[in-house]
């Protein structure tokens, strides 16, 4: 019987079978060969190439098992990290997706006999969080990427700094209130009983300066105060007001108010605050990655849109192409002196300015703020990565 034609149903079926997954028991991990049926697998086991691979493996079987185990672990964790991230997922779901790849490492070639043993091993090694439920074992990937850990530490540091600033502000306000209360002498009124020797005599009140706030009831034959006493009382009250106004005006000149000091603290905090996301719409950036080819390497473009703080849609200036890039693949562009720039980080973030000069040795620049409440302020020593040219 002749060989089947290329477009015959049998040939087409054979090509479809060769591309798909076959039975696990007919796969040889040492030779990395998949057989279609039992007869083919038997013939492969009797072949010279298979016998040669078995001789090599028999010399150092532990080395081959360690190699397959490491490859299986790396591929499994890479799939778990990329596909599911840090979500809690059933281990069988991840395994089924892993074995759907035709060139995967089979578990029977590794040091783990079952998926449960492999799951427990991941938990013991601290690579994943594992827990057993009535429905089976669940795993959760632990992200130990240095970049992710750095971002988490920066976020925790920023939260701690905000809490410290709030505590300092509250403590400062309490201190100001305490100082204000200490400056005032709390007067306690003294009460005395009214004594009258003669019921027919009229009662008068002595309002002299030496009375000190206590009303002493005395008996006298006079029925009213004379005009001289009223003048004395008015002059004494006016003198007190002048003294109190002068004494309150002097510390106001020496000390700043609580509101002014709080505003200075907030301005200082904003000036020193930095973020890891610096992309802003409307700035000119340069592509520094070579993954896109030489066509876009070292080429400039304008940021049209910022997605999730760290991704930008860049329109190339020469070709007009639109590319979606991460900020790690971009860098800022420093224009010539006299051109307009945008501050991307630090206390002046979001303000536009004019580039005055460049210090090439210190990799810094001097700009003049053109917008906002700090318009006209001259800022020295601002880093290259904190400013970029405006489109």
From Swiss-Prot:
Residues 206-258 are annotated as: Disordered. Residues 51-160 are annotated as: Winged helix-turn-helix (wHTH). GO terms for molecular function: double-stranded DNA binding; RNA binding; zinc ion binding. GO terms for cellular component: cytosol; nuclear matrix; nucleoplasm; nucleus; protein-containing complex. Signal peptide: none annotated. A zinc finger (C2H2-type) spans 28-50. Residues 282-332 are annotated as: C-terminal subdomain A. Gene3D superfamilies: 2.30.30.140, 2.30.30.30, DNA/RNA-binding protein Kin17, conserved domain. The modification N6,N6,N6-trimethyllysine is found at residue 135. Residues 338-389 are annotated as: C-terminal subdomain B. Highly expressed in transformed mouse AtT20 neuroendocrine cells. Expressed at a lower level in testis, kidney, skeletal muscle, liver, lung, spleen, brain and heart and kidney. In testis, expressed at much higher levels in proliferating cells than in differentiating cells. Not detected in embryo. One of its GO terms (biological process) is DNA repair. CDD domains: KOW_KIN17 (cd13155). Its main location: nucleus. It is found in: Nucleus; Cytoplasm. Residues 147-180, 252-275 form a coiled coil. Keywords: Coiled coil, Cytoplasm, DNA damage, DNA recombination, DNA repair, DNA replication, DNA-binding, Metal-binding, Methylation, mRNA processing, Nucleus, RNA-binding, Stress response, Zinc, Zinc-finger. The C-terminal domain (268-393) is organized into 2 subdomains that bear structural similarities to SH3-like domains. Both subdomains adopt a similar 5-stranded beta-barrel-like fold and are connected to each other by a short linker of 5 residues. The 5 beta-sheets are packed at approximately right angles against each other. A highly conserved groove formed at the interface between the 2 subdomains, comprised of Lys residues 302 and 391 and other positively charged residues, may possibly be the site of RNA-binding. Recognized by antibodies directed against the RecA protein. Belongs to the KIN17 family. Associated with DNA polymerase alpha, RFC1 and cyclin A, in multiprotein DNA replication complexes. Also associates with replication origins at the G1/S phase boundary and throughout the S phase in vivo. Involved in DNA replication and the cellular response to DNA damage. May participate in DNA replication factories and create a bridge between DNA replication and repair mediated by high molecular weight complexes. May play a role in illegitimate recombination and regulation of gene expression. May participate in mRNA processing. Binds, in vitro, to double-stranded DNA. Also shown to bind preferentially to curved DNA in vitro and in vivo. Binds via its C-terminal domain to RNA in vitro. This is DNA/RNA-binding protein KIN17.
